[in-house]
Amino acid sequence: MDEDRAVEAAASAWPGPSRRRRLIEFLLHASTRLDLRPVVKYTALSFFADRLLPSLRRKMGFCGARGGRAVTSWLLEPLRDSNLELFALVAVWIASKIHELKPLSVKSLKALGDRIIADQHFTCRDFANAELVFMEVVEYNIGSLNIAFTYLEELLVQFREISKIGDLLNMDVCMEILDILYETEDSSWLFNSPCQLAASALVTAYAISVPKQRWEFPILPWVTFTTSYDEEEIMKVVLTILMHVLKPDEMKGKGERDFNI
C-alpha cells in the first residue's frame, strides 16, 4: 500500500515545476515566433498544458502508474524534452487547424522546430506521427470552446458593450495574466474552471489597468451576475492571481478596501 502511494505521488509530481515551466515557455516562444493569433495560442496551451501533460501522467505509467489504455510510441519511450517540445508544436498545429482558414503548414513547423528544439531534428513524418500520438493520449479531446481565453474574450466584449470603462481595460494585461498563470505550476489548477478563471482574470485586469479614479463601474457584481459565481469565489481567485502577478511588496498593505470594485 505504501509503495502504491509512493508510485501515485511520483506520477502526480511529473513533469515537475521547472520542467513544466520550460515547456510552457517553449510554447509561448514558439507562439511569438509564429505570430499566432491569441485564440490559437491559448487553444494550443489548453491542449498541451491542460490535456496532454495530465493525460501523459495517467497513461504512460510514470514510475509504474497507469490509468486507461496505454499509448505506445517511440516518441514516448523514452519521453525526452525534445519530444515534449515536438508535442508542444503539434498542439499549435492542431489549434491552427481549428481556428485558421489557412492552418500552419507542417513544413513551417518543422523549420521552426529545427531552430528551437535542441538535440533533435524531426521530420515532417515525425510531426504527423506525433499528431496521431497526441490525439490518442488526449482521447481526441480537442474541443476549443471551454477554455479561459474564449470566456475572457466574451466577457470583455459584453463589458465594452455596456460601459465605456471597458475601453480602458487592456486585453494585453488579461493575456499577460493568463501567461503567468500557465507558467506557474501551483496556479495551474485554476484552469480547471476556465469560466471562473476568466471572470477573475477580468476583475484582476480591471484593478491593474483601469485608473483607480475611474473605478465607477461595479465590475465585481456585474461579473458575478453574468457568470453566476459568488463574489467570494471570484475574489478568492482574484487574490490568488494577484499573488502571482504582483511582486510581494506590491501586495503589502492591500486590504479589501483596495479591491472594492
Curated annotation (Swiss-Prot):
Transmembrane segments: none annotated. It comes from the Eukaryota. Keywords: Cell cycle, Cell division, Cyclin. One of its GO terms (molecular function) is cyclin-dependent protein serine/threonine kinase regulator activity. It holds the Pfam family Cyclin_N. InterPro entries: Cyclin-like_sf, Cyclin_N. SUPFAM superfamilies: Cyclin-like. GO terms for biological process: cell division; G1/S transition of mitotic cell cycle. GO terms for cellular component: cyclin-dependent protein kinase holoenzyme complex; cytoplasm; nucleus. Belongs to the cyclin family. This is Cyclin-J18-like.
